[in-house]
Each structure stands twice: as C-alpha cells, then as structure tokens.
Amino acid sequence: MDWRVLVVLLPVLLAAGWAVRNILPYAVKQVQKLLQKAKAA
C-alpha cells in the first residue's frame, strides 16, 4: 500500500473514531429506551 493513502485516510479514520466514541453512549441509551418501550407495549 502506498504511504500517501495512509496519510489521507489516517485523519479521516481518527475523526470517525473520535465521533463514534463521543456518540456511542447516547446511542446505546436511546436503543435501550426503545427496547424497553417495545417490551412494555
């Protein structure tokens, strides 16, 4: 693999990982709430 591909992809992957790390707890809470509502109905 060409090193230039890594230079281009690395910042994109870092940004995506940072976003997922910040969003994941809220997404998990929302899914759990949705599942609880579905179970209660």
Swiss-Prot record:
It is found in: Cellular thylakoid membrane. Loosely associated component of the core of photosystem II, it is not always seen in crystals. PSII is a light-driven water plastoquinone oxidoreductase, using light energy to abstract electrons from H(2)O, generating a proton gradient subsequently used for ATP formation. Residues 1-4 are lumenal. GO terms for molecular function: manganese ion binding. The chain crosses the membrane at residues 5-23. This is Photosystem II reaction center protein Y. Belongs to the PsbY family. PSII binds multiple chlorophylls, carotenoids and specific lipids. Residues 24-41 are cytoplasmic. Its main location: membrane. Keywords: Formylation, Membrane, Photosynthesis, Photosystem II, Thylakoid, Transmembrane, Transmembrane helix. Disruption phenotype: No visible growth phenotype, PSII forms dimers, slightly reduced oxygen evolving activity in vitro. The modification N-formylmethionine is found at residue 1. Signal peptide: none annotated. GO terms for cellular component: photosystem II; plasma membrane-derived thylakoid membrane. It is a single-pass membrane protein. InterPro entries: PSII_PsbY. PSII is composed of 1 copy each of membrane proteins PsbA, PsbB, PsbC, PsbD, PsbE, PsbF, PsbH, PsbI, PsbJ, PsbK, PsbL, PsbM, PsbT, PsbX, PsbY, PsbZ, Psb30/Ycf12, peripheral proteins PsbO, CyanoQ (PsbQ), PsbU, PsbV and a large number of cofactors. It forms dimeric complexes. This protein is only loosely associated with PSII, and is not often found in crystals. Found on the exterior of the PSII dimer, near cytochrome b559 (psbE and psbF). GO terms for biological process: photosynthesis.
